[in-house]
Amino acid sequence: RELADRSISQPLEKLMDGRRLYQSEGIAEKCILPCEGSPRVVLCAAPIIAAGDVTGVVALLTEDRTATPDAAQLKAVNVAAAFLARQMEE
């Protein structure tokens, strides 16, 4: 909710344009912020691709800049992005 009315960051936008799953490497200096001024960083993210277009992103955020996602977290963002893409196509 605290990020609802903010624009996404340039690195997150580039991640979306890459059209592939992103996972943090656990290196604090390489963290991606979801938007400017956020206290959290992107742990993992998957673009929402509906009708061939990127329409958004599902991102799991964390305050731990050295965290890496586990298999369940990666699967969760992938499934959520695929579900939302199907809903947008209907």
Where are these regions (language model features)?
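A short beta-strand signature within small-molecule sensing/ligand-binding domains used
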Residues: 29, 37-47
